[in-house]
């Protein structure tokens, strides 16, 4: 059995050592044939609090770590482009 890996976008990092990742999946509607985007949210264990909102990260499935956490952070594929006042010079 292979380990499942997903690529998703961090939408919340307000919890300690946990981030919420949204993964979009495009499927065809069974009756109408229209392509619909479905999203699913996963709670992901981030032991060092590396992830920030807007990061594109790779996660993989693991044993249950809590009631809702079954995914582990693997690596950051793309950092978010958050601009704060120090970087823009205000």
From Swiss-Prot:
The keyword Signal does not apply. One of its GO terms (molecular function) is rRNA binding. It is found in: Plastid, Chloroplast. Keywords: Chloroplast, Plastid, Ribonucleoprotein, Ribosomal protein, RNA-binding, rRNA-binding. InterPro entries: NA-bd_OB-fold, Ribosomal_uS17, Ribosomal_uS17_bact/chlr, Ribosomal_uS17_CS. Its main location: plastid. One of its GO terms (biological process) is translation. GO terms for cellular component: chloroplast; cytosolic small ribosomal subunit. The keyword Transcription does not apply. It comes from the Eukaryota. PROSITE patterns: RIBOSOMAL_S17. Part of the 30S ribosomal subunit. Belongs to the universal ribosomal protein uS17 family. PANTHER family: 40S RIBOSOMAL PROTEIN S11 FAMILY MEMBER (PTHR10744), SMALL RIBOSOMAL SUBUNIT PROTEIN US17M (PTHR10744:SF1). One of the primary rRNA binding proteins, it binds specifically to the 5'-end of 16S ribosomal RNA. This is Small ribosomal subunit protein uS17c.
């Amino acid at each position: 059995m292979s380990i499942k890996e997903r690529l998703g976008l961090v939408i919340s990092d307000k919890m300690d050592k946990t981030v919420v990742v949204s993964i979009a999946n495009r499927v065809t509607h069974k009756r109408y044939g229209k392509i619909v985007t479905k999203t699913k949210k996963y709670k992901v264990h981030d032991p060092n609090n590396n992830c920030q909102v807007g990061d594109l990260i790779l996660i993989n499935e693991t044993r249950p770590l809590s009631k809702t956490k079954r995914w582990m952070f693997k690596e950051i594929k793309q950092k978010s482009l958050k601009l704060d006042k120090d970087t823009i010079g205000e």
